[in-house]
Swiss-Prot record:
Belongs to the dethiobiotin synthetase family. It catalyses: (7R,8S)-7,8-diammoniononanoate + CO2 + ATP = (4R,5S)-dethiobiotin + ADP + phosphate + 3 H(+). Its cofactor is Mg(2+). Substrate binds at T41. CDD domains: DTBS. This is ATP-dependent dethiobiotin synthetase BioD. Its EC number is 6.3.3.3.
Length: 227
C-alpha cells in the first residue's frame, strides 16, 4: 500500500491529467487504485469536477472520493469562507486517506492549485497533508519560461518540511517544443535535484480511454512509481 500526493507548481499545469495517467499505469499493472480529491472548487454541486475527468480517462475501475466542493474558482480556504460551507479539516483528510490506503495498492491525492494554497481549517496546505501522511509528492510542472524558478522554489519548500519529492512530471509537453522548453527539460533536474519522471504530451486529456492508456504508459510506465 502506498500514498502519493500530486501537486503542481501552479494551477492549470496538468495535475488532473497526470493523476489520471498515474492511475492508468497502476491499473494496467494490475493494481487497485484510489484517487482522493480533498477539495474541488469552481464546480457546482451537479457539475463534473476533476474526478469525473479522471474516471473518463481511466475508463473506471478507480475508487474516487471527493470531500468538499465549493462553487467559486478560488483557493479552497477562500471559496469555503465565501460560500459559508464548512472548511476541510486536516485530520479528516488524513483519516480518509489512510482508510483508502488500507484497501488499495495505490492511493493518489490530488491537491488544489500549488503546494502552499490554503485548503481548510487553520490554513493547512498540501505540504501539511503530505507531511502528516509521510507521503511522497509528485510535482507537476510547466514546460516553458519560468518553470525552473517555480519548480526550484516548490522543491525547496517541500524539503524545508522534510517532505520527499518523488519526482517531476511535465504536465503538457508540446509536439514542437521551443528552445526554452528543450533547455528546461534538461535543466529541471539540475535546478531541483529530483528526477524527471516523464512528460505528458499536450492534448492527452482529450484522448479516448484506450489512447490515454497507451500515452500514460509511454510517459510514465517506466518510472519508479510504476514498479
Amino acid at each position: 500500500m502506498s500514498i502519493f500526493l500530486v501537486t503542481g507548481t501552479s494551477t492549470d499545469v496538468g495535475k488532473t491529467v497526470v493523476t489520471a495517467a498515474l492511475a492508468s499505469v497502476a491499473l494496467q499493472s494490475g493494481k487497485s487504485v484510489a484517487v482522493l480529491k480533498p477539495a474541488q472548487t469552481g464546480v457546482d454541486v451537479d457539475g463534473a469536477g476533476d474526478l469525473a475527468e479522471i474516471e473518463r480517462l481511466t475508463g473506471g475501475g478507480v475508487t474516487l472520493v471527493e470531500l468538499a466542493r465549493y462553487p467559486e474558482p478560488l483557493a479552497p480556504d477562500t471559496a469555503a469562507r465565501r460560500s459559508g460551507l464548512p472548511l476541510l479539516a486536516l485530520d479528516d483528510v488524513v483519516r480518509v486517506a489512510r482508510d483508502l490506503d488500507t484497501t488499495h495498492d495505490l492511493t493518489l491525492i490530488e491537491g488544489a492549485g500549488g503546494l502552499l494554497v490554503r485548503l481548510g481549517v487553520d490554513g493547512f496546505t498540501a505540504r501539511d497533508l503530505a507531511a502528516a501522511l509521510a507521503a511522497p509528492v509528485v510535482l507537476v510542472v510547466a514546460s516553458g519560461l519560468g518553470t525552473l524558478n517555480h519548480t526550484a522554489l516548490t522543491v525547496e519548500a517541500l524539503g524545508a518540511s522534510g517532505v520527499e519529492c518523488a519526482g517531476l512530471v511535465i504536465g503538457s509537453w508540446p509536439q514542437e517544443p521551443d528552445l526554452a522548453e528543450r533547455c528546461n527539460r534538461e535543466d529541471l533536474v539540475s535546478v531541483s535535484g529530483v528526477p524527471l519522471l516523464g512528460l505528458m504530451p499536450a492534448g492527452s486529456g482529450s484522448e479516448s480511454v484506450q489512447e490515454f492508456a497507451q500515452t500514460a504508459w509511454g510517459a510514465l510506465g517506466k518510472s519508479p512509481l510504476a514498479i
